[in-house]
Structure formats: C-alpha cells, structure tokens
Design a protein with these regions (language model features):
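N-terminal signal-anchor transmembrane alpha helix of single-pass membrane proteins
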Residues: 3-32
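Short juxtamembrane segments adjacent to a transmembrane helix
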Residues: 28-60, 64
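Charged, low-complexity interaction regions
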Residues: 51-62, 82-91, 115-121, 143-154
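Repeat-associated, polar segments at repeat-unit boundaries in modular proteins
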Residues: 73, 96-105, 109
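Acidic, low-complexity, intrinsically disordered interaction modules
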Residues: 95, 99, 114-136, 140, ...
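Amphipathic alpha-helical binding modules
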Residues: 133-135, 139-176
Length: 177
C-alpha cells in the first residue's frame, strides 16, 4: 500500500505539470493566427489583383486591335481616293477592299482570340456582319459623287471612328459583364 501511495505521489505532480503545460499551450495556440489563413488571404489579394489587371489588359487589347484594323481601312480609302481613277478601276478597288476588310477582320479576330473575357474568348464576340458594314462604308464613300476627295476621306474617318467605338463598346460590354 505504501508503494502505491509513493508511486501515486511521484506521478501526480508530473501529471499536474503536464496538464497545466497542455492547457497553457492550447490557450497560446488559440490566440495565434493560423499561418495558413494568412497565406490564403495573401493569395486571394494577389489573385484578385492579377485578374483585375488581366481584365484591363484585355479591354486595352480590344481597343487597340479594332483601332489598328480601322487604321488599315482608312489608309486604303485615303490612298485609293488620292491615287486611283476610281471610276475606271472600280472592279479592282472593290476586289481590294473586300480582301482588305477580310484580312483586317481575321487579323483582329486572331489577336482577340488570345484573350478571354469573363466567360469566353474575346474574338467570339465579333460579328461577321461587321465585315459587310465596313466594306459597304468603303465602297459607298469612295464612290460618293457628291463629295470631293478630302470630304470623302474625312467622311470615312468619321464613319470608321463611330464603328470603332461601337464595336469596342459591344465587345467589352459582352465580354466583361
């Protein structure tokens, strides 16, 4: 009996010390923030920032790509009006205009296909009918007999600027809701 009492006394004090240590350790751990939570918060902030920058970059790409296409069309119209006898070269001008419009449309399409909106690639918001609209503008303005050369060039510049703004706004609004 004395042996059991002696063992109990010797084991009780270390047991109490261990229990107190575990309680204090648990209290300290609860007061500490979990480092994984801090890492998760940091990743959320960084990811959100990257996504927002990517959205802004994509919006800029839409504007630049469509503006470049419009610039090519404007150069074509200006050089055609200035250097060609438009009446005698009508077939060639129409052929060149058709191919230019197709070329700049698909070039813009391929550039926009490298970037995504919220749900889909930016190029998927382009419309095939835009090619016909631009082609029609080129032909109608180049062959407008009521305007002189400078007026036709200015008229096309104004028309293409309106289209650039419309197409850019359309793609951005559809891609980034």
């Amino acid at each position: 009996m004395e042996l059991i009492q002696n063992a109990f006394e010797q084991g009780l004090i270390p047991g109490i010390v261990i229990v107190i240590y575990l309680i204090i350790n648990k209290i300290i751990d609860n007061n500490k923030r979990n480092p994984l939570d801090d890492i998760a918060k940091l990743l959320n902030i960084v990811t959100r920032d990257i996504i927002e920058k990517d959205r802004e970059k994509s919006k800029s790409v839409v504007f630049i790509a469509i503006n470049n296409a419009a610039s090519e069309c404007t150069k074509f119209v200006a050089s055609t009006i200035i250097t060609n006898n438009v009446d005698s070269n009508r077939d060639q001008i129409e052929y060149n205009a058709r191919h230019l419009v197709n070329s700049v449309y698909y070039d813009t399409y391929s550039k926009l296909n490298m970037y995504r909106g919220d749900e889909d690639y930016l190029s998927h918001y382009m419309k095939e009918e835009w090619k016909e609209d631009i082609y029609g503008d080129i032909i109608n303005i180049v062959y407008n007999k009521n305007l002189d050369s400078n007026q036709r060039i200015l008229a096309f510049n104004k028309r293409i600027d309106i289209r650039v703004n419309d197409y850019t706004a359309y793609i951005i609004n559809k891609a980034f809701k």
